[in-house]
Amino acid sequence: MTQRPDRALPGEVSPITVHIDRWRTALPPDAWPDGFPDSGLLWRRDVFAVAQAWHAGRASVRQLLVAVLMWGYGPIGYGPWRTVRALEGDPDGKRLAYALEGLRAPVRDEEALRTAYQRLRDPKESRLPRLGPALFTKLLYFAGYRRAAAGGASGPGTTALGDGQLQPLILDPAVARQLPAEAGVRRGTEWLPAEWLAYLHWAADQARRRGVEPDEVEMAVSQGRFTHD
């Protein structure tokens, strides 16, 4: 049996490969996440570490966005360019901070998730250039996910407050095309807030049935490993 690497979350098969030098060359210095791995391999835990620093006031929201997009784009050549365009749309980070403010609360409800999604979707509020739902749901996931602590364990993205709360998850084409009809998501890319929330409820239900985290359901779906009951 193949052992899961120490850095991997349950359900995470492999790290994302990134070309660090290309990203460093393209990005403004203030946006580079402090202490971010320079190995060229990124696990979800690495991005959650930046999210934890953001929650604690030790990282800016621009640094969080960069960490998310480096992981999200991976080795895709236009990733750094598109990330710079997004950053230029919010040079002081105020639009992103406004979108994510509800996710910083110790306890947040479904309405906070809906509001964050809608703000990032609306150009009149917080939508940034080159940042559609396939990417901004990654930001919502890393900024807002609360992992149920097992045996008192702690760490990035881990808190006992995760129990019972609806968790934000990634919704991109890789996920959407594998979801069953009962998940409530249309094919396409410009999903409505109601579709995202329907998917979150579906994933939460599947996670409860299987005794796993909701993001493990998302990973299984995106990798084509999800099996229906």
Model region roles, listed by residue range:
Residues 71, 141-144:
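Histidine- and/or cysteine-centered catalytic micro-motif in compact active-site loops
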Residues 1-29, 137, 144-229:
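C-terminal accessory module of base-excision DNA glycosylases/AP lyases that mediates lesion recognition
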Residues 57-60, 72-128:
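Helix-hairpin-helix/helix-loop-helix acidic hairpins
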Residues 1-88:
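Structure-specific DNA junction-binding interface
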Residues 40-46, 113-117, 197-198:
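Short acidic alpha-helix initiation/capping motifs at coil-to-helix transition points
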Residues 50-54, 67, 71, 102, ...:
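Residues that form generic nucleotide/phosphate-binding pockets
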